[in-house]
């Protein structure tokens, strides 16, 4: 694995081509991550199900805003999606100027922070959605998914995009680190 | 900000000193992260509270294993802690050989994965502990912390170490990336 450390100057054109490839892959992964976080936020944000007779005295309408963890999920996915859109110009700049150093460092640190944010959001939402599906006998929390069938399906589905974005952000950090190491 | 890109060869001794400083800081942060994840896992894992008459027919004993999210918290913090201990020799090697490239790349990708793991664990546990404290009126989940006072305090407290480790791992990724960029 250490063979790449010798003769770096003689392989400059090849290295540059690979760096450009890495930068293009970075851009593609970023676009996919934008789509998946945006889809997650929209899918969760637009979920609602009205149950006319859930309790005898109120009309029950289930929305994401009823559960704080799902609200956090929508907000966090929107933030990550906005950040990823803002990072696209920088990613395009890296294709043109593949030796950039400080801008890649900036991307790595923000990508890591956004990785933490999107992971926190998807895992808090997962904990709550899991509870909605299964309930918890010891804590006496009942599963609410028998009543709220389509609500539970939509919320479960919208987790997928967020977990996808998590994996993509780990890959993006790896790509940026590889680009830094290749210089 | 781009001024560092010129005259890199002439500043080699200074750069090496800074790189060594970065590597030492990396080691210190790793040790702190080991302690905080280990403390979190132990604090959560040893929590239990017995309520003799919570319900009239069973003796209620609250443990972390009653809630899947808290079990995940203990497991994930143990894994991250074990990984961080295993990464210490590599971190020490970086102090001696500050120009290392591939081993830093390996550390960055594993640090990013462990960041995702510890964030997922702490945020899922936070969602459940928050629910235990506040309950949720819409889903008809009652707050269980009135009865389980010391259980709730211990579990809330053990979240701190995990969130600390999250911040430390973001800093570790930044330090590794900086070391790669400085080479």
Swiss-Prot record, chains A, B:
It is found in: Cell membrane. It comes from the Eukaryota. Residues 1-23, 93-104, 180-183 are cytoplasmic. Its main location: membrane. Disulfide bonds: none annotated. The chain crosses the membrane at residues 24-44, 72-92, 105-125, 159-179. InterPro entries: CASP/CASPL, CASP_dom, CASPL. This is Casparian strip membrane protein 2. The lineage of its organism: Eukaryota, Viridiplantae, Streptophyta, Embryophyta, Tracheophyta.
